[in-house]
Amino acid sequence: MSVTATPDMATPRAAGPTRHAWMGPALVVVAVALLAGWSVFYARTSLAELPLYFAGRFLVIDATSLLFLLLVNAVFLGISVYMSSRVSTSRVLADKLLPRSALTLAFMLAMNLGLMANHLLLLWAFIELTTLCLAPLVAQGDGPAPRRVAWHYLLYSSMSLALTFLGLMCLTRSAQLQGIEMSFMLDEMTVAIPSAGDSWQRLGLALMLFGMGSKLGLAPLYAWLPETYETAPTSTSALLAAVQFNISIVMVLRVLQVFRGHDTGFVAHELLIMGCLSLTVAAVQVMATRNYKRLIAYASVASSGVIAIGLSVGRAAAYGVLLYVVSNAFVKSLLFLTAGRLRAVYGTNETAPLAGVIRVLPFSGALFAVGTFALLGFPPFGGFMAEMLILSGIVQAGNLVAFTLMCTMLTIIFVATGRTLFPMLWNPPAQHRPPVRETWLTALPKLGFVTALVLLGLYTPAPISALLVQVAQSIGGR
């Protein structure tokens, strides 16, 4: 078998043995243990027993943390299987498997602890720690200047977290002026913060959401996201888009839970503006890009916009937003891992040199097509149902301007994505290329993601649906 490959994405014979080959299976074992542990915990624990507190109440397991612990560890299992299967075919991954695995495990440790944080400052610190773990991984990418991109990622992340920290300090000032002893424990904040907020409280909320919005890739501070997702190694792109993204979502949900029932109309307006702006920016950029990995990145900006608009609506769209977040994690994992396979064979992220992908890579091409359909919100995938619920919530809220803009921008993204990706998949190649052999082990996690997406669209298992409902209710949903 002969395939085109870059030095960073070598053929199986070029990779050779590595002293640390055991790290691949070890990564999978850790991922299985994490997912199995949280699954058993959920199976043996009634939602009525939650929340449960640990470590002096600094850690908590409630519906929100449990939902995202199950989600990110399920995604991590798929990514770890992919990494393990690629050790024999990628020289760079084989040579750097030990540091990559160590950083990935440190990242997942910070993720799991951060999702359980019952303290806003502790959650903030764990988000920063995940960034510090991922930055060296981004710097190992095969783009033209991966270290520069990693520094940009660190700079934007630090700026967003600094804005969030400034927001927390504004909340502290608000509490001092009102004679309240400020505690950032989530359960204590919910009780202590007065319903009638002052200007310091509003400023703090606005800064926190703006900071977390930039971490999610919401406009206007989104510039770090496309270049980071494109430049990072495939597995790191998936960790960024499908795992770290979710701890930032949890931070936003925690803030909304604490201030539920307060005068937060301005927060809804802030989320609505950032969401609409993000959708508009994503639509324009998707029309212009001819790079399939960067296109997925701009689709992530659009996804953040949809989530922000849904959260701005509040009660009516809460369940749809959570279903969308869960579906989005599986879609981005599927697309980035499949894009990594395309990059390994063709040696480029550009769409122009690619044609007939589905003939050369029948399995990966088909999975990339399925992922594209899921990304665009086709039935029977979970994203379709989630978008319908969000749009229904927007109509119920009476915001027809947001409804019209969201429908228009999603339509533009739909057409532009199809125009860019479908010729790459189905057009006949300029020269004959024999089909490339693909292993079931590499395809297994992607098949798992597709199965999850179909289940979310056709039939969400009752335990997962109950968890989604409880989290939706915690932010004022129904």
Task: Name each region found by the language model.
Residues 2-102, 469, 473-474:
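Transmembrane helix-loop-helix hairpins at membrane boundaries of multipass inner-membrane proteins
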Residues 16-30, 91-106, 121, 142-163, ...:
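Membrane-interfacial loop-to-helix junctions in multi-pass inner-membrane proteins
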Residues 42-57, 163-222, 249-256, 260-270, ...:
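Juxtamembrane/interfacial segments at transmembrane-helix boundaries in multi-pass membrane proteins
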Residues 63-73, 120-130, 201-214, 263-277, ...:
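Structural signature of hydrophobic alpha-helical transmembrane segments
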Residues 65-122, 144, 210-214, 241, ...:
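Helix-loop-helix module between adjacent transmembrane segments
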Residues 99-106, 112-200, 285-350:
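Alpha-helical multi-pass transmembrane bundles of energy-transducing inner-membrane proteins
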Residues 137, 229, 256, 307-316, ...:
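Interfacial segments of multi-pass membrane proteins
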Residues 219, 332-338, 401-436:
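Predominantly late transmembrane helices and immediately cytosolic-facing juxtamembrane segments
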